């Protein structure tokens, strides 16, 4: 599969660092952001092969990020994977089902991250 450029967006530092460290060990170029606004800025600056994004975050949540990306960077939509504990919540469940964006539910395993990278990066290259 090779080295991928991956963005990790999560307001929880421990989660963000866990994902980033696991992906770096696999040899990937990893960038991080602690909210959707910072993530959107990075999406505007770099071409990412994959974006792991939390849903519930301050300043700009994952749903607002998705809507901005859909409008301004539609080519990135097929590269997003939501990593969230909110997959079945009343707030985000209907949104997730309507987008068809892949979801990894928290708590997750490193194997789930590896599988997502393998599947998503293979589709976008």
Residue ranges of each PLM-predicted region?
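Acidic catalytic/metal-coordinating carboxylates
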Residues: 34-38, 61-65
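Hydrophobic/aromatic residues positioned on beta-strands within the core alpha/beta folds
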Residues: 81-84
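Charged docking surfaces used in two-component/phosphorelay signaling
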Residues: 17-25
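C-terminal output helix
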Residues: 99, 108-117
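Active-site residues of response regulator receiver
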Residues: 54
